Amino acid sequence: MLDPKILRQNLEHVVEKLRRRGFEMDSDTFLQLENKRKEAQLAIQSFQTKRNQLSKTIGMAKSKGENPELLMAEVSQLNDELKQEEANFETIQKAFSDFQLAIPNLPHDSVPDGKSENDNREIRQWGAPPGFDFTPKDHTVLGERDNQLDFEAAAKLSGARFVVLRGSLARAHRALAQFMLDLHTDQHGYEEVYVPYLVHEECLYGTGQLPKFREEQFQVAGDRNFFLVPTGEVPLVNLARDEIIEAPALPKKWVAQTPCFRSEAGSYGKDVRGMIRQHQFQKVELVQLVQPENSYQALEEITRQAEKVLQLLALPYRVVELCAGDLGFAAAKTYDLEVWLPSQNKYREISSCSNCEDFQARRIQARWRNPKTGKPELLHTLNGSGLAVGRTLVAVMENYQQADGHIRVPDALKSYMGGVDYF
C-alpha cells in the first residue's frame, strides 16, 4: 500500500510513476473520496465540539440548580447525529482503503521503462550453454524412462498441470530442495522456518496478492476463510504482521521450503506440457526484513544468493532487470534469474528477486524501532526464489542429459544422491 501522505501531497507525481508501469490511476475518484473524507472529518469534529460545549453548559446549569432537560435532549440528538456521521466516515474510509489496495507499488527510479518482458534488460550472463553431439531431449521425454515423470497418473488424481515423480527423479527433486536449504542456512545466514500452507485472507492482502489476483488463488471451501499459499513469501512476510523489531535484531533473514498453489488463470495455452507451469510446485523462498536505507543493498545480496544455487549446480543462466511494465504488483524493483533450457534453446525464469520497499510493511504494519528517534517506522521487505525446485530439476535434466537418456548428477548434488554419478 502506498503512503497516503504521498498520494495527498504529490498526486500528479504518483500518477506519472504508476503510468510507467501501465497503471492508470483514477485521480478524479481519489480526489472525490479525499474531499468526502475531509468533509466527514470536519462534520464529526463539529458535532464533538458542540456536544462538549453543551456538556459544559449542562454542568453549569446543574450547579445553578436549573433544569437541564432541554439541553440534555439536545445532547442526545447530537449523539445520534454524531453516530450517523461516524458511520458515514467509516463507509468513506472503507471505500478509500479499497481504492488504495488496488494501486500497485511505485517503480524505483532505476527501473527501465517498458511495457512487457520483451523490454526487460539483461544485466549479466553466467556459464555457457552445453554443447551436445546429439539432439537434446525435452525433460518430458527424458522422464519417460521407467515412467519416472508421470503426467497421466497425476491427471487421474488431480487433472492437468500436476505431476507424479517416481524413483530417481523424486529423489533428485528432494535432494535439490535439501541442497538449497543447506546452502542458504549454512552459508547465507538464513534461519529456516516451517510455516503453514493454509493462510487467512488477510495474509494475501498483506503481501499484495489480494484483491487484484483473487482468481489466481486456491481458496478452501467452507467457512474458515483459508487459502492455499501461492508462495512461501506470504506466510514468511506475514510473520512480521503487527510486530515492532528492535534495530539490533535486523536484518531478519528467513528461508522456507513450501508447496506453492496457483490456478494459472491467466496462462491458458502456455507451457501446457511438462513441469514449467503447474498448479502445485515446491519452492525454496528467501525473505529479508531490513532497515529502509539497506534495502537495495539487500536486493543485490538476495539475488546473488539465488544465483549461487545455479552456479554450484553449474547451470547456465542470465540475470534480467524487469522493466516497469513487467513488475509484480508489490515490487518496486525486480531481478529475474533465467536458466538455460537446451530443448527450448532459450532462457526460462527460475527465480524472481524483489524489493517491495515499505509497500507490504504498510499493509501488515511491520515496523522496526529507530534508535535515533525511539519511534517505530516501517520496515522494507524483500523476497526471492532460491529456487523453484521443479524448474531446477528440469534444468538439471536437460543440461546434464546423456545420449542414452540418463542424467549425470551435478557434483554439488552427489552427496544428496547417495554418491551416484547418473540417474
Swiss-Prot record:
Please name the GO terms of the biological process aspect recorded for this protein, alphabetically.
selenocysteine biosynthetic process; seryl-tRNA aminoacylation
Where, in this chain's numbering, is L-serine bound? T231, G232, E233, E285, S385
Pathway(s) of this molecule: Aminoacyl-tRNA biosynthesis; selenocysteinyl-tRNA(Sec) biosynthesis; L-seryl-tRNA(Sec) from L-serine and tRNA(Sec): step 1/1
Matching entries from InterPro entries are given as: aa-tRNA-synt_IIb, aa-tRNA-synth_II, aa-tRNA-synth_II/BPL/LPL, Ser-tRNA-ligase_type_1, Ser-tRNA-synth_1_N, SerRS_1_N_sf, SerRS_core, tRNA-bd_arm
**Gene Ontology molecular function:** ATP binding; serine-tRNA ligase activity
Q: Which UniProt keywords apply?
A: Aminoacyl-tRNA synthetase, ATP-binding, Cytoplasm, Ligase, Nucleotide-binding, Protein biosynthesis
Asked if ATP-binding is a keyword of the record, the answer is yes
User: Out of the domains of life, which is the source?
Assistant: Bacteria
User: Where is it localised?
Assistant: Cytoplasm
Catalytic reactions on record? tRNA(Ser) + L-serine + ATP = L-seryl-tRNA(Ser) + AMP + diphosphate + H(+); tRNA(Sec) + L-serine + ATP = L-seryl-tRNA(Sec) + AMP + diphosphate + H(+)
Give a GO cellular-component term.
Answer: cytoplasm
Question: Recorded E.C. number(s)?
Answer: 6.1.1.11
Entry's CDD domains? Answer: SerRS_core
> What does the similarity note say?
Belongs to the class-II aminoacyl-tRNA synthetase family. Type-1 seryl-tRNA synthetase subfamily.
Q: Relay the domain remarks.
A: Consists of two distinct domains, a catalytic core and a N-terminal extension that is involved in tRNA binding.
Assembly and partners are described as: Homodimer. The tRNA molecule binds across the dimer.
Q: What does this protein do?
A: Catalyzes the attachment of serine to tRNA(Ser). Is also able to aminoacylate tRNA(Sec) with serine, to form the misacylated tRNA L-seryl-tRNA(Sec), which will be further converted into selenocysteinyl-tRNA(Sec).
Please identify the protein, giving its name as recorded: Serine--tRNA ligase
Task: Give me the gene this protein comes from.
Answer: serS
